[in-house]
Amino acid sequence: MKTVTVKDLVIGTGAPKIIVSLMAKDIASVKSEALAYREADFDILEWRVDHYADLSNVESVIAAAKILRETMPEKPLLFTFRSAKEGGEQAISTEAYIALNRAAIDSGLVDMIDLELFTGDDQVKETVAYAHAHDVKVVMSNHDFHKTPEAEEIIARLRKMQSFDADIPKIALMPQSTSDVLTLLAATLEMQEQYADRPIITMSMAKTGVISRLAGEVFGSAATFGAVKKASAPGQISVNDLRTVLTILHQA
């Protein structure tokens, strides 16, 4: 399986990498949050742009991205607009969503974009090609905050992302029971052992699914999300606790 290298970070080997999400509503908050995050122990900075109020002003969005890049130049920057239908803060049209991601790519400030699988097949394929032409990696994602589908469906979605040339397929699902967590872990393992030719990221959310955020190295998930301050999804734990557990499991 090939790895993915962003800056000096190699994703897909060793302990799972820690991603943290920064959720700021304006330029002032971006500045203050960035300074606070700079001291934290993590590997990838995700900017959750759906929390940003001034989305219609592309210049403001790019100015905020520039602050993040300058404050943490060594950290890979993942640009993510999470749609309302997949648990995000704002609803925008598909056209606006694609345009926003293209503007981020054009800026030269971001290393990776998050692209939702169910945006539309043609738009997804075109945006992946556009990102790759500008040396930007694509995390292709799917989120369900209500349920966990069968393992076969989880694997089918991850394989579809892979067929669309995502650099890193990602899926996050809500368990309704402990057995749902096992379904997610079993699907992750089967994907990793039988189909994946690149790193994948999977997680089961909420308190029930916490084990999935810790056991990625065992089952085949290459990264996990931790919280510096406010969690961006149910079940996230602090980056310090997360690093401790990931290191223990890696060294065992």
Swiss-Prot record:
Keywords: Amino-acid biosynthesis, Aromatic amino acid biosynthesis, Lyase, Schiff base. GO terms for molecular function: 3-dehydroquinate dehydratase activity. Gene3D superfamilies: Aldolase class I. It holds the Pfam family DHquinase_I. The keyword Mitochondrion does not apply. Pathway: Metabolic intermediate biosynthesis; chorismate biosynthesis; chorismate from D-erythrose 4-phosphate and phosphoenolpyruvate: step 3/7. The keyword Acetylation does not apply. It catalyses: 3-dehydroquinate = 3-dehydroshikimate + H2O. 3-dehydroquinate binds at residues 21, 46-48, 82, 213, 232, 236. One of its GO terms (biological process) is aromatic amino acid family biosynthetic process. The active site is at 143 (proton donor/acceptor), 170 (schiff-base intermediate with substrate). It comes from the Bacteria. Its EC number is 4.2.1.10. Involved in the third step of the chorismate pathway, which leads to the biosynthesis of aromatic amino acids. Catalyzes the cis-dehydration of 3-dehydroquinate (DHQ) and introduces the first double bond of the aromatic ring to yield 3-dehydroshikimate. Belongs to the type-I 3-dehydroquinase family. Homodimer. This is 3-dehydroquinate dehydratase. The gene is aroD.
